[in-house]
Amino acid sequence: MASNQQSYKAGETRGKAQEKTGQAMGTMRDKAEEGRDKTSQTAQTAQQKAHETAQSAKDKTSQTAQAAQQKAHETAQSAKEKTSQTAQTAQQKAHETTQAAKEKTSQAGDKAREAKDKAGSYLSETGEAIKNKAQDAAQYTKETAQGAAQYTKETAEAGRDKTGGFLSQTGEHVKQMAMGAADAVKHTFGMATEEEDKEHYPGSTTTTTATTRTTDPTHQTYQRK
């Protein structure tokens, strides 16, 4: 009897142990399955998160690239417009400078021609005046010389009946005539002093050429007024 009871208890204990082992195995399988499911979900979640992160980064990169491209295009366009404006301004400035230089050159040419014309006119007038004075002086000298020769001739003829004292007086008179001719030439060219002009041409303010002749039986005088 005791053996049967022991066997029954041993079987019951073994059955309980098997049942517990089966339950433990089932629990372990459930936990393993649950862990596998969680791992799968975690992996899927991580994969989804990585995909979303990559897509977001891709979108941001694309947006950044587009913004940079747009900015570069705007910068290039702005630089192009500024370069064009600068070139136009420089061209306009160069044109204005060239035009101003042309106008100044033209004005300088006009002034040079005007100065040349004035100088030519002045030289022409001066040359004509000198020529006239020289002609007047030559004419006066010629007339004076002719008068002196005539006077000398007449004096020589009259000297035949005169004394030596009269001949001496005649020689002095000829000397004075020669000096008068020299003073007249100086006066003609404006080289005479104011005192000489007053002495030889009293009351005269302009240069005039004239020859007068006074004749008396014993004396002849030639004077330039």
Swiss-Prot record:
Assigned protein family: Belongs to the LEA type 4 family.
Biased composition (Basic and acidic residues): 28-39, 49-61, 71-83, 93-119, 154-163
N-terminal signal peptide: none
S-S bridge residues: none
Compositional bias ranges of the Polar residues kind: 141-153
Induction: Transiently up-regulated during prolonged dark.
The LEA 11-mer repeat repeat ranges on this chain: 53-63, 75-85, 97-107
A GO biological-process term: response to cold
Organism name: Arabidopsis thaliana
Amino acid composition bias (Low complexity), ranges on this chain: 205-225
Protein's name according to its UniProt entry: Late embryogenesis abundant protein 29
Predominant cellular place of this UniProt entry's protein: cytoplasm
Repeat among keywords: yes
